[in-house]
Amino acid sequence: FQEWSEARELDWYLLENPDHKHMQNWVKKLLHIYQKNPALYELDSSWGGFEWINANDAERSIFSFIRKSKDGKNNLLFVCNFTPVERSDYRVGVPKHKTYKLILNSDDAEFGGSGKERPVNYKSVSKECDGRPYSFAYPLPGFGVAVFRY
């Protein structure tokens, strides 16, 4: 295939390749999530819109953080695994005792992942983790990214 050029159309035939189609699905979903979630853009240039949950899990190469909206509602929790090892019961600390809704899972089949069924809602419990008073466990896939709204 040819390198991208503003002078010609994209190589749309590449979408016949499943890997290219999976990447298109991923980018499409990311753009949709960006448009629908003010936490990703309202406080983009302020530290008030970002909070680390855990940036120090070097042993497992996993980090987690929160993106916040101005009104504090519909914040997003990101959990990212940078190893091929699935963490079947990865516990992540969270700031509030509520339900966290999975809105993006990179392991979904539409993105080329395993397509394993996972619950959508995760209720936090009063179990301290990552310096937070509450937490929940999630089956984090290898090389996976999970995004939760709360």
Model regions: which residues?
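Carbohydrate-interacting/catalytic domains
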Residues: 1-150
